[in-house]
Curated annotation (Swiss-Prot):
CDD domains in the record: enoyl_reductase_like
Gene Ontology CC annotations of this record: cytosol
Family recorded in the similarity comment: Belongs to the zinc-containing alcohol dehydrogenase family.
Keywords: Oxidoreductase, Stress response
Organism: Emericella nidulans (strain FGSC A4 / ATCC 38163 / CBS 112.46 / NRRL 194 / M139)
GO molecular function annotations of the record: mRNA 3'-UTR AU-rich region binding; NADPH binding; NADPH:quinone reductase activity
Induction notes from the record: Induced by the antibiotic concanamycin A. Down-regulated when grown with elevated levels of potassium chloride.
Function of the protein: Involved in osmoadaptation.
Highest classification ranks of the organism: Eukaryota, Fungi, Dikarya, Ascomycota, Pezizomycotina
UniProt name for this protein: Zinc-binding alcohol dehydrogenase domain-containing protein cipB
Pfam families reported in the protein's UniProt record: ADH_N, ADH_zinc_N
EC numbers: 1.-.-.-
Domain of life, source organism: Eukaryota
Length: 314
């Protein structure tokens, strides 16, 4: 039976509608391998604003957006043993893939798949945790399947790789704290040559473009001139790869359907968060409280942020 809840959502009432309309939403019951979460914080991703303003993905309107959730379990599905009501959790809401309203983040209560959710230690706030899911899932998708960069660095280091990355000079110390062994200025006119030189004598396991379009040609140039696997995963598709280099677009929701989701959210992340070996990143920029603040937060994200991710407290 459905939990006794009063749900509400920031609704996208029709294609390209602005602003979101905050009003009542259905109550949900978790099925097998699902949990119902009372959301305490949600984060904003670039895809949210582009879905609202450009309507490039097929959706059934009215609909709800959002993928990053941190909150408290209020009900578990019939076969769920890993979670209990009252548990603090962080998880990836995968409604963009399932097209189910209950699987989206911008509402008071969300259904999460158990293989896309992790227990959250009490010392990590909901707001700090909410920055993780989509970036983490996308990084895992790019690294282990055939705001992403922060997670890709940490996952790459955890998997035993030496990580080279690019950033603006003001963020050099930040990405080194995440585990990058060498950092290069992406504004430099010689950044590609500098990376190729630094990789001499090393075997490249692959590259991940966490920006898309503008960064893809440079990333491809570097791997094409280096020894090792000439493979680039990118968060945006449409790039025509040159001969000898494979470019594949990735999206985080795909890990819900294979062993990677469980490996990240069940086997790795809970222990890493508790031990402090994985840091929620980038830094949460809290833009408001309540579902009424979601539109302003999406608009703020669209203006651009550096080493920060826009979050709304609920």
């Amino acid at each position: 039976m459905a939990a006794n809840i009063n749900n509400a959502a920031a609704w996208l009432t029709e294609a390209k509608a602005h602003p979101f309309q905050v009003k009542e939403a259905p109550s949900y019951t978790p099925e097998e391998n699902e949990i119902l979460v009372k959301n305490h914080a949600v984060a904003i991703n670039p895809v949210d604003g582009s879905l609202q303003s450009k309507a490039w993905w097929p959706m059934n309107y009215p609909t709800i957006l959002g993928q990053d959730v941190a909150g408290e379990v209020v009900q578990v599905g019939p076969n769920v043993a890993r979670f209990q009501p009252g548990d603090r959790v962080v998880g990836h809401a995968v409604g963009m893939a399932t097209k189910r309203l209950q699987d989206n983040a911008f509402q008071a209560y969300t259904i999460l798949q158990t293989n896309m959710a992790s227990q959250l230690p009490s010392e990590i706030s909901y707001e700090d945790a909410a920055v993780l899911p989509l970036g983490l899932s996308t990084a895992a998708s790019g690294l282990f399947q055939d705001d992403v960069g922060s997670n890709a660095i940490q996952l790459g280091v955890a998997a035993g790789y030496e990580v080279f990355t690019t950033a603006s000079p003001k963020n050099f110390d930040y990405v080194k704290e995440l585990g990058a062994s060498q950092v290069f200025d992406y504004h430099s006119a010689t950044v590609a040559q500098d990376l190729v030189a630094a990789l001499q004598g090393k075997t490249v396991a692959g590259a991940m473009d966490c920006i898309g379009f503008a960064a893809t040609p440079l990333t491809v140039e570097v791997v094409s001139k280096s020894q090792g696997v000439k493979f680039v995963s990118t968060v945006k598709g449409g790039f025509q790869a040159p001969e000898g280099v494979t470019v594949k677009s990735v999206f985080g929701t795909t890990i819900k359907d294979n062993q990677v989701g469980k490996a990240i959210y069940e086997d790795y992340l809970p222990k890493a968060l508790k031990a402090g070996s994985f840091i929620p990143a980038p830094v949460a920029l809290v833009a408001g409280k309540g579902l009424e603040s979601v539109q302003a937060a999406v608009d703020l994200q669209a203006q651009g942020t550096s080493a920060q991710k826009v979050v709304v407290s609920l």
